[in-house]
């Protein structure tokens, strides 16, 4: 695990395992996650269903935060990459392939991002549901097998509202806004505002998130002089 100064104090035990100090959950953080400088992992409870065996199963970028007991559920091949200055507020990620999130994104309570779904060849008769559940009960981790995971890409500066669901194979373009309880099953273009179930585009926003606009916004919302933070 690559380590820098985090936004939470952490301790290492004699076995080299990393714990968040004063975490209410007793478990350690997984060894194959990469926490960027000033990131906020919140609690080890978020990783109780994290089974990735990838060298880096999760990367949490500079100053990004996991809040409100978000959960990261991964299969052995799952890989989650989160950029800089991202807010994950009480969401759930389900990843058996890859989920990639760009810088400056916000996710509200109850969002679900899943790159895994049952494909059309799964038949849901009562008998097959019963057999599937009984077979799953024999698994040591009670893991249902998904047959066709597809990568998800969420580009920079996307805002996802309360309770939205993002389904496998979706790309959400830069600067888009996804409304509360929206179900996204198809790609969303940059700067689009999408709402509904299924998602429909109701308008497009002005592409005004350039570096110059960001600096002006920081000056407006942070009038007190602040020292420059190097996030490279």
Indicate where each model-derived feature is located.
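Domain-scale signature associated with acetyltransferase and cell-envelope carbohydrate enzymes
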Residues: 1-157, 162-166, 174, 190, ...
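Short linear motifs in intrinsically disordered
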Residues: 62, 183-184
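Active-site-flanking alpha-helical
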Residues: 163, 181-182
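Short beta-to-alpha loop/turn elements within the nucleotide-binding domains of ABC transporters
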Residues: 170, 182, 188
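Binuclear metal-ion centers of metallo-dependent hydrolases, dominated by the metallo-beta-lactamase
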Residues: 178
């Amino acid at each position: 695990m690559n380590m820098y100064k985090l936004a939470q104090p952490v301790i290492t035990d004699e076995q080299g395992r990393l714990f968040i100090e004063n975490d209410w959950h007793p478990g350690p953080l997984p060894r194959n996650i990469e926490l960027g400088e000033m990131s906020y992992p919140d609690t080890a409870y978020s990783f109780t269903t994290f089974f990735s065996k990838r060298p880096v199963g999760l990367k949490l970028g500079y100053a990004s935060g996991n809040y409100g007991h978000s959960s990261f559920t991964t299969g052995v091949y799952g890989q989650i990459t989160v950029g800089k200055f991202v807010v994950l507020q009480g969401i759930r990620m389900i990843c058996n392939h890859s989920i990639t999130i760009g810088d400056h994104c916000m996710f509200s309570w109850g969002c679900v991002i899943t790159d895994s779904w049952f494909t059309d060849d799964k038949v849901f008769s009562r008998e097959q549901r019963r057999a599937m559940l009984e077979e799953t009960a024999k698994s040591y981790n009670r893991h249902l097998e998904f047959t066709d995971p597809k990568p998800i890409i969420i580009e920079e500066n996307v805002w996802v509202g309360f309770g939205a669901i993002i389904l496998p194979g979706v790309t959400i373009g830069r600067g888009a806004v996804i409304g509360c309880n929206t179900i996204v099953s198809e790609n969303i273009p940059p700067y689009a505002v999408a709402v509904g179930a299924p998602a429909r585009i109701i308008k497009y926003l002005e592409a005004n998130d350039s570096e110059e606009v960001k600096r002006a916004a920081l000056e407006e919302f942070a009038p007190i002089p602040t020292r420059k933070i190097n996030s490279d």
